A protein has these predicted regions:
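Short, hydrophobic beta-strand segments
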Residues: 1-5, 59-69, 105-115, 149-156
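Terminal amphipathic helices with adjacent charged low-complexity linkers/tails
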Residues: 2-60, 64, 98-100, 125, ...
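Extended, hydrophobic alpha-helical segments in both membrane/secreted and soluble proteins
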Residues: 18, 73-83, 90-150, 162-169, ...
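Flexible helix-coil linker/hinge segments at domain or subdomain boundaries
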Residues: 23-33, 129-145, 175-181
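Accessory "access/gating" subregions that flank catalytic or transport cores
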Residues: 28-44, 69-88, 94, 216, ...
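A glycine-rich phosphate-binding loop feature that marks nucleotide/adenosyl-phosphate handling sites
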Residues: 32-48, 97-108, 142-154, 181-201, ...
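Polar, glycine-rich mid-to-C-terminal structural blocks
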Residues: 156, 160-221
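Ferredoxin-type iron-sulfur electron-transfer modules in oxidoreductases and energy-metabolism complexes
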Residues: 196-277
Length: 277
């Protein structure tokens, strides 16, 4: 929670009263106060949240699914109460972060998409959450886009008549489906292009020179890439980045692209794949 004041005394009065309210209602367990330039630490931590969550060990990971749902701020408490009940029915843990002040909390269920149950829950959680968001007249994608993940549920969210208008508009302006095909209309099933393979066999991964036992193996390490592209740093933004990308600005030279390559290669250790190599 961010406070502003013309003087340090006024600012101190505001956050002191706020902390007292939290303590009175037994909300929270720590109340750190950051002043001036120190506030950047809090915002940096929030930005790093996605990458930090991807460092959990094992195949059960927080997934992008319902993290972009948004409702009116006054409806957010009731929405979150009902969403929690949905997730409890599936017996899944979840993480929550981001901007409550805009009516949007990034809720990420922790699922194992390499198991059949995880994939079924993946679809059903989004289906039930879509109905919940619709109930509160919210948005499935309050900050970003529906895309291939949520596009399948646009007819459910908007209604068939409105969706038919979307299709008609797309046909008029892009009859050949050149621009961003399958993102808003005629979207393929949400689980048609999952990056993970339920049949992954990690027993035949080759020995590597470097030790990746802390991440279990090199495949698990490559799977930690969330795809968010935070690695695409330049001399202007600062931060560590491969010099090859700094020079070429080519996606294939990014850390993300190399993680994708390793995941695709080591994730398909079938006999047919071995023969192709």
């Amino acid at each position: 929670v961010e406070f502003f004041g013309d003087t340090l005394e006024a600012l101190t009065s505001k956050y002191t009263k706020f902390i007292a309210i939290l303590q009175e209602n037994e909300q929270g367990f720590a109340y750190p106060v950051l002043i001036g330039d120190e506030t950047k630490k809090a915002w940096d931590l929030r930005k790093a949240g996605l990458g930090l969550l991807r460092n959990l060990p094992g195949d059960t990971q927080p997934v992008n699914l319902i993290e972009d749902c948004a409702v009116a701020v006054e409806d957010l408490p009731d929405y979150m109460d009902e969403l929690e009940l949905i997730l409890q029915r599936f017996h899944v843990q979840y993480s929550v972060y981001a901007h409550a002040g805009a009516g949007e909390l990034h809720v990420e269920p922790m699922l194992n998409l390499k198991e059949e149950k995880g994939r079924k829950d993946f679809r059903e959680i989004l289906k039930q959450t879509t109905e919940l968001v619709k109930k509160y007249k919210g948005s499935l994608s309050g900050e970003h886009g529906d895309g291939r993940l949520r596009g399948e549920f646009i007819p459910q969210m908007m209604g068939e008549k409105v969706y038919a208008l979307f299709q008609e508009t797309k046909q008029i302006v892009d009859p050949n489906g050149v621009f961003n095909r399958g993102k808003i209309v005629d979207t393929p099933p949400m689980d048609a292009f999952l990056r993970v393979d339920s049949l992954q066999n990690t027993n035949h991964l080759p020995q590597t020179v470097f030790d990746f036992s802390a991440q279990e193996n090199i495949l698990r390490l490559s799977e930690k890439c969330s795809g968010s592209g935070d690695c695409r740093k330049t001399e202007i933004t600062g931060g560590t980045m491969c010099p090859s990308f700094m020079a070429t600005r080519q996606e294939q030279q990014t850390t993300r692209a190399r993680a994708n390559m390793l995941r695709n290669f080591y994730g398909d250790q079938t006999e047919a794949h071995a023969n192709q190599l």
